[in-house]
A protein has these predicted regions:
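Beta1/beta-strand and adjacent pyrophosphate-binding region of the FAD-binding site
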Residues: 4-20, 36
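Short phosphate-binding/catalytic loops that engage adenosine nucleotides
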Residues: 33, 119, 171
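Dinucleotide-binding Rossmann-like beta1-alpha1 core, especially the glycine-rich loop
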Residues: 53-132
């Protein structure tokens, strides 16, 4: 349940109770900051519930992006443990498809970079893709790059877990504040 009374003061005021606002409130509260989050309607009532929630490592061509993606994956596990609130993670895997040789070479470089940094990416032939995904039309596919441990989260569940975690760490979250 949302806190209903506006405090007289706060060190930080976060505007918006979507996944970004709740993440900011969570992380600042974790650092001991006095945080108030104001949401004009209800948590997740804006664009958060429209998000796809893809959680992938493949495609990262920089160490910084890989670090951010690894942090996110670890955060979702930690949130579930800390709050008891599910994040909706489903480890469905992720596959990137290449339809021409230039793309195959580009994805091979990305896959090698990812493997160098501990991400398990497998190059698959069209036949192997068909074995994994029998309904796939692989006629134009040159190769696929499969990240078995990737998947998706439920953005609403993650937001609610972050909100709960933020409250547990002392943040005030106030809804219905137009």
């Amino acid at each position: 349940m949302a806190d209903q009374q506006l405090p007289d003061s706060a060190r930080v005021v976060v505007i918006g109770g979507g996944i970004i606002g709740c993440s900011v409130a969570y992380h600042l509260a974790e650092e001991g900051c006095d945080v108030v989050l104001l949401e004009r309607d209800q948590l997740t009532s804006g664009t958060t519930w429209h998000a796809a929630g893809l959680l992938t490592n493949f495609g990262s061509g920089s160490e910084t992006l890989l670090d951010i993606r690894k942090h996110a994956r670890n955060l979702y596990d930690r949130l579930e443990h800390e709050t008891g609130q599910q994040t909706g993670f489903v480890g469905s895997g992720f596959i990137e498809l290449a339809t021409d040789e230039d793309r195959v070479e580009e994805y091979r470089r990305i896959a090698a970079f990812n493997r160098l940094h501990g991400n398990d990416i497998h190059e698959l032939s069209a036949a192997e893709i068909k074995d994994l995904f029998p309904l796939a039309d692989v006629d134009d596919i040159k190769a696929g790059f499969y990240a078995e441990h990737d998947g998706r989260i439920n953005p609403v569940d993650v937001t609610m877990a972050m909100a709960k975690g933020a409250r547990m760490k002392g943040a005030k979250l106030i809804e219905k504040t137009p």
